[in-house]
């Protein structure tokens, strides 16, 4: 059986941070396959459509939140994946700071005028 291929959807506010590195390491361990990090593996592609094309090629998406919400880009990536029957997981921290994963069943727009807290992810 081939290894899973995943996409790490996260806020650009986390790019090149220790938080990004910690999340990425956790996702790699959890996925046990190839993980595409747009910041590291893709760079600036411009339009969201280019990132959605990459998502078409993966088995699942791991998303992280920023202050309990996802920004417009992560929202669009997760919504696209869900509509295309690609599994989406949200990576969160418990009260002790330990990462855990939940499967996402829906993405909901919460504030179309704020691209940082644009939506939220509803997990099982």
For the regions a language model picked out, list residue spans one by one.
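Conserved catalytic or regulatory cores that recognize and/or transform ribose-phosphate-containing ligands
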Residues: 1-124
